[in-house]
């Protein structure tokens, strides 16, 4: 129930009166004093409702404008009311001046204001069984106000009111308030509920009030209650303990027998007599009030003022670029989330970073809530479309590739230019993760898996042998994996050196040798979570096994939905003889393998694809001498380049392009056509469109094709020159006599698929070649993963007496020129000794 007085204040500029009477919870301004701008309401206390008197003095547009900025109710006459209702305004937002309300008004949710009391029977009829507030305006005395306050809310100018017990020629608001209270308690006290204000609205406890304590509380604007032990004393909350309270608002319940004190407790103090407790109704400690968003709000404010050095939250406050990057990252992750649990998890992350941004700029949760309240009070709505810069560009529903002639150098350069990858912002996010895992080890892995993957683990590592129930897959899947691993092993075993030691006699008596040794500890990163990627585990693990790596460590995040590892990946790890599986993903998994933790063996090399965070972490650790860890290769978006001529099957070509386009909107898809007629070109375009329309990921395909190209070459040489310039991850040859062009015409490519019956899909899974390949043009200097990727090659030399005689003088001369005397002497001493023994 509202306080039984509505103070009239002459202007919003009268801050003193607003402050004095804000505990009433409502004030009325004349319309002449109000300028309804966008943020008009925000100048007032959060729990103060604003009313405006516009009777006979406002148009419908002006009234709607008042309602839109958050005015709780507008006082109007009946004509103004009807016009506003016709304009679509809700009746509940009006206080209508009436003598005798019409039937239409009586069936509405509007409040009334009258200048004289109604008869008892009319009052009962008009107040809708006490569900409608009726205000009354008059030239009140205190006794008159007390009498009318039983059934009405007196509207009284603030100049005639006082918060004191009594003041000459003024009406005491406390006298009016207590006159409306009732109680059935023998001691005559009133049950009183103590709560906090926005944003927590926490119930602190139950106390008891007397008329005297209420009068004192209103006058002093503090928490004052009645002591039940000492009836002749008032209880000033916190007078001895320091746990004082500021009175924000006073109200009563619908039966007028329970009072609500809304108070602001002193920071760091609770309400309960058990001094460590914030509220009598829970276990929250005094210096950590509330839960959820209110707790986050108070915690972040404390961190802003008192955060220790090294605090992540302080780092966010200090590094605005990092905070902006995290906001964008978390919004993207929320958009990508699918399950109820995943959406809630990602939304919580986004809210945290949004609140950091707000607190950094002086905005509290109560300010946000007030804006929500104001927006909920709007009566006219805009269409609500996104601003142009955020509207998604129309999808290329025609699924057409842009056609470029090789004679147009600028267009060719545009078609073959890959998107720029920005790593600086990503590294700002990755470095804190790396440092956390380095310092906290297993504990950090458990925390970060909970944070990023939504899975709470007891331990971050699954040791071999792996439980059978964690690799429970169908017999069909087992057969597919077994066949694929067999072919991959056969191809990679053939890459092993044909002889254990390769030796060459470079000069008579000088024997140079080279031999291969496996890298001892290798870490294989297999993306997981929502994806099922046993093929990646096979492509990385089988060559490691063939090379003879002693310890194979697999890292893969558990599924958010099940909390478990992908069973197909566990099965592959079992077949590989992996030592363990690190149940983590992202930069944290890479860091754990690079530096080691209590339960993760430090790896000498880390391999495997991943998102931008995985790539950034791999690039970082390979350059950190503390890690002493190498990686397979840099990574970028997946890509395919198809060379096709006029005899190529259009459906085959289209399927190869689309199998790459469905990977993601940033995938690269290029078709180089050799000597194509317009008819053949149209045949290719039609096949792409026909197949794309029926794909489950057709929207992703459409976006990819929107920046994909067909380059028209005149000759095969021209086509291969363009391909070598681009250096594709996958090169597919659908041309006549394709094998004849391999290897002489190919300089730069990750893997080549020769002929019409060699789709990329075969290489991705089961043919035997490796699908972990250089992207983004790195095929110019990197190979795909192969057996040698898991080996290091050691050289040795044996120099005999004859050999030293043959090369000794050359060595000494070169050492002399370079000024390395000890080098020269190392040979000279030996040659002198040989001469002495002759």
Swiss-Prot record:
PROSITE patterns: HISOL_DEHYDROGENASE
Keywords: Amino-acid biosynthesis, ATP-binding, Histidine biosynthesis, Hydrolase, Metal-binding, Multifunctional enzyme, NAD, Nucleotide-binding, Oxidoreductase, Zinc
Cofactor binding note of this UniProt entry: Binds 1 zinc ion.
Entries under InterPro entries matching the protein: Ald_DH/histidinol_DH, HisE, Histidine_synth_trifunct, Histidinol_DH_CS, Hstdl_DH, PRib-ATP_PPHydrolase-like, PRib_AMP_CycHydrolase_dom, PRib_AMP_CycHydrolase_sf
NCBIfam families named in the record: hisD, histidine_hisI
CDD domains attached to this UniProt entry: Histidinol_dh (cd06572), NTP-PPase_His4 (cd11546)
Pathway per the UniProt entry: Amino-acid biosynthesis; L-histidine biosynthesis; L-histidine from 5-phospho-alpha-D-ribose 1-diphosphate: step 2/9; Amino-acid biosynthesis; L-histidine biosynthesis; L-histidine from 5-phospho-alpha-D-ribose 1-diphosphate: step 3/9; Amino-acid biosynthesis; L-histidine biosynthesis; L-histidine from 5-phospho-alpha-D-ribose 1-diphosphate: step 9/9
Annotated coiled-coil segments of the chain: none
Domain of life: Eukaryota
EC number of this enzyme: 3.5.4.19, 3.6.1.31, 1.1.1.23
Annotated stretches, region: Histidinol dehydrogenase: 361-838
Reactions this protein catalyses: 1-(5-phospho-beta-D-ribosyl)-5'-AMP + H2O = 1-(5-phospho-beta-D-ribosyl)-5-[(5-phospho-beta-D-ribosylamino)methylideneamino]imidazole-4-carboxamide; 1-(5-phospho-beta-D-ribosyl)-ATP + H2O = 1-(5-phospho-beta-D-ribosyl)-5'-AMP + diphosphate + H(+); L-histidinol + 2 NAD(+) + H2O = L-histidine + 2 NADH + 3 H(+)
Protein name: Histidine biosynthesis trifunctional protein
């Amino acid at each position: 129930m509202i306080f039984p007085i509505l103070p009239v204040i002459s202007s919003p500029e009268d801050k003193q009166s607003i402050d004095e009477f804000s505990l009433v919870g409502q004030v009325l301004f004349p319309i002449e004093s109000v300028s309804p701008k966008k943020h008009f309401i925000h100048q007032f206390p959060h729990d103060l409702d604003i009313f405006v008197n516009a009777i006979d003095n406002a148009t419908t547009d002006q009234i709607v404008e008042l309602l839109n900025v958050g005015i709780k109710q507008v006082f109007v006459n009946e004509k103004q009311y009807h016009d506003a209702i016709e304009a679509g305004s809700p009746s509940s937002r009006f206080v209508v001046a009436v003598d005798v309300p019409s039937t239409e008004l009586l069936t509405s949710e509007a409040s009334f204001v009258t200048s004289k009391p109604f008869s008892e029977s009319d009052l009962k009829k008009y107040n809708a069984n006490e569900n409608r507030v009726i205000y009354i305006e008059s030239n009140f005395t205190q006794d008159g106000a007390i009498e009318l306050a039983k059934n009405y809310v007196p509207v009284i100018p603030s100049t005639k009111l006082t918060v004191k017990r009594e003041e000459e020629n003024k009406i005491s608001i406390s006298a009016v308030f207590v006159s409306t209270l009732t109680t059935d308690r023998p001691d005559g006290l009133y049950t009183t509920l103590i709560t906090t204000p926005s944003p927590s609205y926490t119930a602190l406890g139950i106390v008891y009030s007397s008329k005297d304590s209420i009068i004192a509380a209103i006058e002093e604007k503090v928490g004052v209650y009645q002591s039940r032990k000492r009836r002749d004393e008032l209880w000033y909350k916190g007078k001895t303990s320091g746990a004082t309270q500021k009175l924000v608002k006073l109200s009563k319940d619908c039966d007028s027998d329970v009072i609500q004190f809304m108070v602001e407790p002193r920071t760091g103090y609770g309400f309960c007599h058990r001094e460590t407790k914030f509220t009598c109704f829970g276990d929250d400690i005094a210096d950590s009030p509330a839960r959820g968003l209110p707790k986050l709000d108070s915690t972040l404010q404390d961190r802003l003022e008192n955060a220790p050095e090294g605090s992540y939250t302080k780092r966010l406050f200090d590094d605005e670029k990092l905070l902006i990057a995290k906001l964008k990252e978390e919004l993207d992750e929320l958009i990508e989330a699918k399950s109820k649990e995943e959406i809630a998890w990602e939304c919580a992350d986004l809210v945290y970073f949004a609140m950091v941004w707000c607190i950094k700029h002086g905005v509290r949760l109560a300010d946000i809530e007030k804006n929500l309240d104001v927006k909920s009070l709007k009566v006219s709505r805009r269409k609500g479309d996104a601003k142009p810069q955020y509207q998604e560009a129309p999808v290329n529903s025609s699924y057409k590739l842009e056609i470029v002639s090789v004679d147009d150098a600028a267009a060719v350069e545009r078609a073959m230019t890959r998107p720029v990858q920005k790593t600086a912002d990503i590294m700002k996010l990755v470095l804190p993760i790396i440092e956390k895992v380095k310092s906290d080890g297993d504990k950090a892995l458990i925390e970060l898996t909970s944070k990023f993957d939504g899975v709470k683990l007891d331990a971050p590592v699954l040791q071999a042998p792996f439980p059978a129930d964690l690799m429970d897959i169908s017999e069909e899947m087992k057969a597919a994996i077994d066949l694929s691993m067999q072919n991959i092993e056969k191809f990679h075993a053939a890459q092993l050196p044909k002889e254990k030691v390769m030796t060459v006699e470079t000069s008579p008596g000088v024997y140079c040798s080279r031999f291969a040794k496996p890298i001892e500890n290798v870490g294989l990163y297999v993306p997981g979570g929502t994806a099922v990627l046993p093929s990646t585990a096979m492509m990385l693990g089988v060559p490691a096994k063939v090379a003879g790596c002693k310890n194979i460590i697999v890292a893969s995040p558990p599924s958010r939905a099940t909390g478990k590892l992908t069973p197909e990946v566990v099965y592959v790890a079992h077949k590989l003889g992996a030592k363990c599986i690190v149940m983590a993903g992202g930069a944290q998994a890479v860091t754990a393998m690079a530096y080691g933790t209590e339960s993760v063996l430090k790896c000498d090399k880390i391999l495997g694809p991943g998102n931008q965070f995985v790539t950034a972490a791999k690039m970082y650790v390979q350059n950190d001498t503390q890690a002493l860890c190498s990686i397979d290769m840099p990574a970028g978006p997946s890509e395919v380049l198809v060379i096709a001529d006029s005899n190529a099957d259009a459906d085959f070509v289209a399927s190869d392009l689309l199998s790459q386009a469905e990977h993601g909107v940033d995938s690269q898809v290029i078709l180089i056509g050799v000597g194509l007629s317009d008819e053949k070109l149209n045949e290719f375009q039609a096949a792409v469109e026909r197949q794309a329309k029926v794909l489950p990921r057709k929207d992703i395909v459409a976006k990819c094709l929107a920046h994909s190209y067909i380059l028209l070459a005149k000759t095969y040489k021209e086509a291969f020159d363009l391909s070598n310039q681009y250096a594709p991850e996958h090169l597919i040859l659908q041309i006549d006599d394709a094998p004849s062009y391999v290897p002489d015409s190919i300089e730069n490519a990750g893997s080549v698929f020769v002929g019409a019956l060699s789709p990329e899909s075969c290489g991705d899974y089961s043919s035997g070649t490796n699908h972990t390949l250089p992207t983004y043009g790195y095929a110019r200097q990197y190979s795909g993963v192969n057996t040698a990727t898991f080996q290091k090659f050691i050289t040795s030399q044996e120099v005999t007496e004859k050999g030293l005689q043959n090369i000794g003088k050359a060595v000494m001369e070169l050492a002399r020129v370079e000024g390395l005397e000890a080098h020269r002497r190392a040979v000279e001493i030996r040659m002198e000794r040989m001469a002495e023994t002759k």
